[in-house]
A protein has these predicted regions:
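Auxiliary Fe-S-binding modules of radical SAM enzymes
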Residues: 1-65, 286-396
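Active-site mouth loops of central-metabolism enzymes
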Residues: 110-112, 133-147, 203-210, 278-280
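Generic hydrophobic, aliphatic-rich segments that mediate packing or membrane embedding
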Residues: 118, 145-149, 184
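Short, flexible helix-coil linker/hinge segments at the edges of structured domains or between repeats
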Residues: 121, 138-146, 237, 246
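Conserved alpha-helical substructure of the radical SAM core
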Residues: 129-167, 386-388
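Intrinsically disordered, low-complexity coil segments
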Residues: 135-144, 192-200, 335-345
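Conserved AdoMet/S-adenosylmethionine-binding subsite of the radical SAM
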Residues: 150, 154-160, 168-315, 322, ...
């Protein structure tokens, strides 16, 4: 489903025929993600030619194959109880954040990427054009400020004992600049003080290094929990072709140096780099997984799924077997070279994301399953009611 998407037209018919939905409402229905058995959350990508589809039988949702076999049960993922809240400047939360599963908050604080202006954008990316193709999604092209991000996290903490956040942005016009990073980290440190590493607000920032290697330490000193400098592709030839802006303005050597330097400050398990499975040969992708793991860097293996508005729109991703074999090999490497990834302690105390709620891929679902970990969401649960009363909150 991550690779080839889902057919949704049959589901829309079921919604009108058996669930009493208005035809127009059903026709426009596009759910963002699904919850599958064993607490696996997955993004939904509509594809009218997909091998799988969603159907409703006896008021229950199922994934069905092309010959009408029921593959597994499924559930839509509801919004958290604070989703209709407003920030202190009266901006609706739906303009600030996207929810992944029940534990992860996903912020893109700036959808503008200057590489699109200079024609050096990452070839797989549709970050800036996405606004034209997905107007119904709960995202906004407007820049989100530090206080708004902190307001959402503050609200999440009232209903969830340990919410995690992923923060990303496009490359700013000053391509070597920090692009709002400093302001967000200063706001988070003020709103959520910490006295040790594990008390830092669990935020994973996926940003570009700058030309100044000292900025790696600067961002750490400002209180960031975890950092991801994404390779996207590991092979150096593909790197130049697929991520020309990163190659031109930062360069591969400095990118690698920034990752290695980050481990010195954050420690193993808090530095990440994403690589897209299917964008390059498996051999070089696996070389990238090994390169990262050997240096204490956690690989994020993301299945290639061509995006509308990107240079790869209309391309076919690899087969399911290729993708599964690649993920299994990558997971084996991760568990062998980063053994802490196979412990409940890491996922509960140190990981900046919830493995089950990470909808950008399924590598961590495989890692946890192969390690025999079954404490889904690290024992955390999103509550329908506040964890503390308004009275207790005002006293604290």
């Amino acid at each position: 489903m991550l690779v080839n998407g889902l057919r949704l037209n049959e589901l829309r018919k079921d919604l009108t025929d058996s669930q009493g939905w208005d035809a127009a409402k059903a026709q426009n229905f596009l759910p963002a993600e699904l919850k599958l058995p064993n607490e696996v959350f997955v993004q939904i990508r509509e594809n009218t030619e997909a091998n799988f589809r969603l159907r409703i039988f006896e008021d229950k949702l199922f994934v069905q194959d092309k010959v009408n076999n029921q593959i597994c049960s499924a559930d839509f993922v509801g919004l958290p109880p604070f989703s209709k809240n407003f920030t202190n400047d009266l901006t609706p939360f739906e303009k600030i954040v996207v929810y992944n599963g029940t534990c992860n908050l996903n912020f893109t604080w700036n959808y503008y990427c200057d590489y699109f202006r200079t024609k050096q954008e990452c070839k797989f990316c549709n970050l800036t054009p996405a606004q034209d193709f997905y107007p119904e999604e709960n995202i906004s092209n407007a820049r989100k400020n530090a206080a708004q991000v902190a307001d959402v996290i503050h609200a999440a903490k009232k209903y969830h004992p340990d919410p995690k956040s992923i923060l990303t942005r496009g490359t700013p016009a000053d391509k070597q600049g920090l692009g709002g990073t400093v302001q967000i980290l200063e706001e988070l440190a003020e709103r959520f003080p910490y006295s040790n590493q594990r008390e830092r607000t669990k935020v994973l920032m996926t940003i570009s290094p700058t030309k100044d290697i000292n900025d790696v330490k600067l961002i750490y000193d400002l209180g960031l929990h975890s950092i991801s400098y994404n390779f996207e592709v590991f092979d150096k030839g593909y790197w130049k072709a697929i991520v020309p802006g990163k190659d031109s303005f930062i360069g591969r050597d400095l990118w690698e140096e920034s990752l290695i330097k980050a481990v010195e400050y954050y420690g193993p398990g808090r530095v990440f780099s994403a690589m897209i499975a299917g964008m390059e040969p498996r051999k070089t992708l696996i070389e990238g997984v090994n390169w990262c793991a050997d240096r204490g860097i956690v690989p994020i293996v993301v299945p290639f799924s061509p995006e509308t508005g990107s240079h790869f729109e209309g391309f076919r991703p690899p087969t399911y077997k290729w993708m599964m074999d690649t993920h299994l090999e990558a997971a084996d490497i991760i568990l062998k070279k980063l053994p802490f990834m196979g412990t409940e302690e890491y996922w509960k105390l140190d990981a900046p994301i919830c493995a089950e709620c990470f909808t950008g891929g399924f590598i961590y679902d495989v890692v946890k399953e192969n390690a025999g970990l079954i404490d889904y969401h690290s024992g955390n649960e999103l509550k329908k009611e506040k964890l503390i009363s308004e009275k207790e909150e005002s006293i604290s």
